[in-house]
Amino acid sequence: MPPKKFKDLNSFLDDQPKDPNLVASPFGGYFKNPAADAGSNNASKKSSYQQQRNWKQGGNYQQGGYQSYNSNYNNYNNYNNYNNYNNYNNYNKYNGQGYQKSTYKQSAVTPNQSGTPTPSASTTSLTSLNEKLSNLELTPISQFLSKIPECQSITDCKNQIKLIIEEFGKEGNSTGEKIEEWKIVDVLSKFIKPKNPSLVRESAMLIISNIAQFFSGKPPQEAYLLPFFNVALDCISDKENTVKRAAQHAIDSLLNCFPMEALTCFVLPTILDYLSSGAKWQAKMAALSVVDRIREDSANDLLELTFKDAVPVLTDVATDFKPELAKQGYKTLLDYVSILDNLDLSPRYKLIVDTLQDPSKVPESVKSLSSVTFVAEVTEPSLSLLVPILNRSLNLSSSSQEQLRQTVIVVENLTRLVNNRNEIESFIPLLLPGIQKVVDTASLPEVRELAEKALNVLKEDDEADKENKFSGRLTLEEGRDFLLDHLKDIKADDSCFVKPYMNDETVIKYMSKILTVDSNVNDWKRLEDFLTAVFGGSDSQREFVKQDFIHNLRALFYQEKERADEDEGIEIVNTDFSLAYGSRMLLNKTNLRLLKGHRYGLCGRNGAGKSTLMRAIANGQLDGFPDKDTLRTCFVEHKLQGEEGDLDLVSFIALDEELQSTSREEIAAALESVGFDEERRAQTVGSLSGGWKMKLELARAMLQKADILLLDEPTNHLDVSNVKWLEEYLLEHTDITSLIVSHDSGFLDTVCTDIIHYENKKLAYYKGNLAAFVEQKPEAKSYYTLTDSNAQMRFPPPGILTGVKSNTRAVAKMTDVTFSYPGAQKPSLSHVSCSLSLSSRVACLGPNGAGKSTLIKLLTGELVPNEGKVEKHPNLRIGYIAQHALQHVNEHKEKTANQYLQWRYQFGDDREVLLKESRKISEDEKEMMTKEIDIDDGRGKRAIEAIVGRQKLKKSFQYEVKWKYWKPKYNSWVPKDVLVEHGFEKLVQKFDDHEASREGLGYRELIPSVITKHFEDVGLDSEIANHTPLGSLSGGQLVKVVIAGAMWNNPHLLVLDEPTNYLDRDSLGALAVAIRDWSGGVVMISHNNEFVGALCPEQWIVENGKMVQKGSAQVDQSKFEDGGNADAVGLKASNLAKPSVDDDDSPANIKVKQRKKRLTRNEKKLQAERRRLRYIEWLSSPKGTPKPVDTDDEED
């Protein structure tokens, strides 16, 4: 409540003396008293309001009088003639312009008028409107337009609108050009003025809706409808709901007229211009809704072409001062940005949009971007999002030196990943000044140096690429020139719709834009449909569109792919298609073209969709691919057989549906031709090694007499001799077309005639083998060198191993081990002995089926030897990546990688270790657990309940045993030898595993954020690790999951069985560098000589059940792009001349340093006597005898 000495405004005004010159209005406010004016009607003393009432009555302004006024209006051109009427003697003072200031003036204290126009105001706006209409040029629809302001109901308005549309339907008027000629947009702009009656404004929207419906389906006449969008959007902010609804209907009708590509290239720029204008915020909200609808209705690849123009405008809207508009603008921008398919950026879209809206988040955003391993190709849409943030970071005065360092690194990385210079051309002028500023002003030399490198990359001159070479994307000018050149050749018959518009600039511009965008996204089918609709549906016009337009455009885009000549070969496949997996688009509107007898190498990064493409072909799911009756395809891949594993080889192949008519003799002959003798054919499928299983698949393909062989990593499990055989087989059969996915560069060099490369969701074709491809595309040099420039892996350092102070001490050992599988006639391994240290870099080599994997399984404890013993340090942790990576995750396809790792280690132990054969408790061993033993401690026989502790005892350990039915205070410490002697070896081993795992996990937090960081360290993107089920991952991504799982508990030894099988070249290089720089021991089985030769100085040759250890003088570090690391573990020159393991009798190889014994006096006398006698003996020896060395060792 206000203090009493103050009055509210109403009380204050009531207390004021009455002004004789002002008269109160019943609607609020005051009118000037006409009696106070010299030139007014002073004959009456009534109030101004009463005077107005009398004026209205005297002017016959009742309904009947107004109708009379309307009826007389048609006889006059404007309101100036109204001064001839007797009842309006005073009306000539206004001349149709409303009240003059001398007769009506709003008082300073008069509140604003309501939104509802008074009768006089409506009359005034109608007067103004009709005057403007009369000043326009006369057109066939002028008379109908002029009657709309006179209509009393919406029905009357619709009748006039119907007449207007009928006028468009008359011969000669049915072209959209009449919209411009009759200046309909100008008329409607006057209709929607706020002072006009709502009926007139609503009629304007109905005219737009009806015109849009009339021209719908008549391409390219919709080009003339574009100006109507601004008129309709302006009316969205109208105060009358009927007008708003009509405006929304008009916008929907307009949008329905345009084809999809026109929405993005023609309509969207108009909406963006409207958003940049000074329109009302309600109208801009409607414009954002139009943007959302275009986003929902259009293809993503078309929308990506608009990012450069759309993102800045939508960012401005998202930062508008009007809260409602800014909120909707932010949502629209985020949804718009999210259509971009970029795995590197997709987890950070929200942060990017937040940064665009709020510049204070630039440091956080730059820090996040600097931690991204950019792998996906960088395109114009990606740069449209990142360049504004990077540019702001470069120019902010508050940017720290660390932030500038991160920014210039991101700029350099992005620029290097741009395959097409045109993608970044428009952004270089934005980035150059900021980078140059950092070069000139940065305080740290390191930042200046990095900025200099980024500057050089930005300024790189690529004139060689520009010389007479198509840039890969049509510009609008090029599209226009192409259209005009080909329109000259058109046969304009009666069915050709475009004939009247061939010289019309509006239509030419419209068609040029559509031709350009459809060509740039390679959507030839949609472009052909549009041009056919424009030029007519006759056979001659269809042929003209297909040959003159589509064929010539495709030739322009595929210059490097020569079309078939007589001597090139027979074309067997030529189809356009798109390929998606789940929600991810792998290939978008690309072309697959195969020639008979050619061998195509399919190259691309992990997850690009190489195997998915081949599987789609094999399953008949690829659009346009010939059916199996026309073209036989056979998909050859290495796969695990489940219930079929117990079948013999002939029966296994005979089960194939396509080989039902093939005799068993023919099957046996085919198997014999690929190396299966009678003894091998008698084996079961499950007993075959990986290499023989692959040969089995190849034999099946031969029997099917396939026209196209689809080979997915055919050399993965083949030894050198079998790879040679496969190469010769493919080279000999020139009638078979092959599509090959392989990361073996030597194999691709030998067999390929063409390379198909994945580039920005398209298939690019290169003639020649892999070497020729690298010459044409130097950035693909990673196929010949091991580099981590495109992908990185980092392994956690191994933990401390108790008692092992030297990296050359043995930590795992096999002694005289013999092993044979159940039912086998001869042992797989016989009398094998070997040992490993923390510095070991061992390659296990040998032919398929020689027993390499068996040796590794025995060493890691997956198998138990029949004879001999396998010993290892009790705390030794081994990370094992099996030959078939899927076997680790086969039962967890529904889990994400993050969830799988949590499951695997949630109880502190590695669950995969517990599944090994050496850890499983047999029935006999379970029975033994109930056996009571006596350890001679005076308490008699007792049964063991569990082992609960461990401590050192001499050169071994003793274990704390909890006895069944005895309290913990009666626990006993029992030596390991005693427990093993009584048969509790697996119980001891289980506890050792638990202790080793606990020690390794001591520094690990099993929480999602830490696990995500661990996956990123091994090269798996966080988005995939956290949100993609394992069943949806590619082979290369699954291998990374298995590697991450094996490395989680910081192992000391890493055992890799065919690690290169599923990895692409980038990931292979990253793995090689990670192994080289890791400080633990490594054992690997691999037929990849390049990989093994660059890493392993020691080799174990396994053949015929025997193993031979062999050392090499040096490793070939030239395979690494960075020249190698001479200081890497296991590769130092000092280690090459001697074995990597110092052997002794201890399983843990913990040598105890002997303490030097002090000699007694008698011992010293005896020592001196020995030395004297030795010296005398030397003096009496022949001349030239070397002097013996004094030593305390009696034997010496």
From Swiss-Prot:
Region (Disordered): 1-49, 103-125, 1137-1166, 1177-1196
Residue span(s) of domain ABC transporter: 570-786, 812-1129
Coarse class of the protein's main subcellular location: cytoplasm
Residues bound to ATP 2: G846, P847, N848, G849, A850, G851, K852, S853
Pfam families, per the entry: ABC_tran (PF00005), Chromo (PF00385), HEAT_EF3_GNC1 (PF24984), HEAT_EF3_N (PF24987), NEW1_HB (PF24988)
Subcellular location: Cytoplasm; Nucleus
A single GO molecular function term of this UniProt record: ATP hydrolysis activity
Location of Phosphothreonine modifications: T1191
Low complexity biased stretches: 114-125
Superkingdom as given in the UniProt entry: Eukaryota
Biased composition (Polar residues): 39-49, 103-113
GO terms for cellular component: cytoplasm; mitochondrion; nucleus
Keywords for this protein: Amyloid, ATP-binding, Cytoplasm, mRNA transport, Nucleotide-binding, Nucleus, Phosphoprotein, Prion, Repeat, Transport
Other comments on record: Present with 37600 molecules/cell in log phase SD medium.
Function: May be involved in the mRNA export process. Forms the [NU+] prion and induces [PSI+] prion formation.
Stated family: Belongs to the ABC transporter superfamily. ABCF family. EF3 subfamily.
Domain commentary: The N-terminal 153 residues are responsible for the prion properties of NEW1.
Name of the featured protein: [NU+] prion formation protein 1
